Amino acid sequence: MEFFIDTAIVDEIREINAWGVLSGVTTNPSLIVASGRDFKEVIGEIAELVPGGAISAEVTALDAEGMIKEGKDVAAWHKQVVVKLPLTPAGLQACKALTSEGIKTNVTLCFSVPQALLAARAGATYVSPFVGRVDDTGWDGSELIRQIKEAFVLGDIQTKVLAASIRHPQHVVQAALAGADVATIPYKVFTQMVKHPLTQAGLDSFMADWAKRQGASPETPPSEAGTNPVKKEG
């Protein structure tokens, strides 16, 4: 499963991309507003940070004609742009039109298998089920992912399932186990995913042992101790 980051804050993208785990970025009008930046400028900067990565940029028009025009304009900003469209009749119409011109699309705000199938038939590159928001209704967001993926596999549908509305690391695990092709993850959740108390405890133990071996404080890195480290397993 690929990882996208769900943000329009360039510093967050830069930090997580340095880990070597990102395949793309998703944005939406709310995230762009929160960033306080010009939309086109942000997309260009993201493209430089994540070369080759998919960058979802959402249209704001509500009618098909407006979505198509805006989608073409946004797609022209950079070859990495994926035009993000709402899962509405107008959004499906725009998806079909943009796809026919070779423009990649991400149909978002998906909350059911029938909706996902419609997006796929309209030619969507990605369809984005909202895991967290489905959970909020009392249904199981990860089960929705599983059912969509099963339907796509059975129908030999190439549209990728992009798990969105990720709230915590367990949502990422659930999406992976349900067969999602991509999870778009907020910065905060990435920082939660990388941490585990046993990892830090193990590191502290290794460094304390190293300090004893070298007669140095635990803060002294091996490179400054002057001798070869003794490898301790377990």
UniProtKB/Swiss-Prot annotation:
It is found in: Cytoplasm. One of its GO terms (cellular component) is cytoplasm. Pathway: Carbohydrate degradation; pentose phosphate pathway; D-glyceraldehyde 3-phosphate and beta-D-fructose 6-phosphate from D-ribose 5-phosphate and D-xylulose 5-phosphate (non-oxidative stage): step 2/3. Its main location: cytoplasm. Keywords: Cytoplasm, Pentose shunt, Schiff base, Transferase. The keyword DNA-binding does not apply. HAMAP family: Transaldolase_3b. This is Probable transaldolase. It comes from Deinococcus radiodurans (strain ATCC 13939 / DSM 20539 / JCM 16871 / CCUG 27074 / LMG 4051 / NBRC 15346 / NCIMB 9279 / VKM B-1422 / R1).
